[in-house]
Amino acid sequence: MMRKISPAFLGAVIGVAATLTATQPALWSERSQAFGAATEGYRQLNLFGLVFERVRGQYVDKAEPGKLVQFAIDGMLSGLDPHSVYMDAKGFRNLLVDTRGEFGGIGIEVTMEEGLLRVVAPIDETPAAKAGIMSNDIITHLDNEPVQGLTLEQAVDKMRGRVNSKIKLKVRRKGEEEPFQVSITRDLIHVRSVRFHLEDDDVGYIRITQFSQPTTDELKKAIKDLTVQSGDKLRGFVIDLRNNPGGLLDQAISVSDAFLEKGEIVSVRGRKPENIQRFSAQRGDFTKNKPLVVLINGGSASASEIVAGALQDHRRATVIGTRSFGKGSVQSVIPLGQANGALRLTTARYFTPSGHSIQAKGISPDIEVLQDVPDQFKAGTDRIGEASLRGHLKAERDEQAGSQSYIPPDQKDDKALHTAFHVIRNMQKSSGYLPQGDLGGPPPNSIAGPR
């Protein structure tokens, strides 16, 4: 439970501040800007206290003080950007469970938009993915209860539950005339973040589904196992980050580091000019400089974009697919005490090694490959992106709305993947990067221009 704020206490604080301001003009002269900001802050808190007291005393039904404070906090944060949220103690515990990669639920990454849940991406091989939930779907009801009025954390909590229990989702999909209902059986979501196989004995395919605590260790094991399986035939690796919604910043950095010998991976810049952190690669490319292709699409967000941007800027990998989601902000988790939960607050923007912010723009691929999307999926898998989220942080320059997020369920229909295998087999080993337009043959699709 949040600690309740006493309006009387707020009033006392305001009174003291006003007295100090009125009786010490010299100090005001010296520190007018600081005091001005503080006084304005106190005035706004006093306004909050007045409204709080009126609502508590005069609302038609009895209003619980704790809920009023919760509503106020939720409103304050939702007005900042789509990714800043308050988590109560239970929500904070759930977040810690998420980063370990195991929880009971249905397996989707969601964000809140205009009071409804928007699917960023379903996690591979989870109940949601198997039930046909797609990126860009809008969830309006959970077990017949409207999502409108719930916080993001409350909605996520409702989707979790005992293994083998069921939940009904009412879904709105662009292109469908009517909403439809899906019943999903919850399962233990043990998110193995890395999957891999050897393609035709000479290309290592590695899919990273999210960035959780075990991701880098799982990646290195995949590289080692594929190298052993192939003998001396391995030509290179395809790293598939499509529909990967992101995750932990430190894992994005260490995954990038696994493929780089040196150089900056990402810089994180806060509000003040001095609040800049730079993260650089350590010596030792875990693949021994094997050629790389990175696959991205409109569902590749956040940590995925850090990896794709770093490898692209250093010309370590050729990036293939469609423009990424465009989430270029960093959220810090700020604990508020054991009983009070935590804030997940946007505290910085991140920049690729070349100094580009991808906020509301995304990473543009070196080779753009558009999938053949079945008619029933066309409307629901196109034009998603950070720039389409209400209240998003604005881009430094022109914003881009997003791109395709469809991945064909059958590998034989996956044009981006086939292009990646073709590129690897024709890539210059010395650079690990295919010069733009050089596919060793006719390009199977269009070549993207410079970012």
Model-found features: residue ranges?
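N-terminal activation segment of mature serine protease catalytic domains
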Residues: F35-S84
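Conserved PDZ fold ligand-binding element
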Residues: F52, A128-T151, D240
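PDZ/PDZ-like peptide-tail recognition elements
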Residues: F71, H83-A121
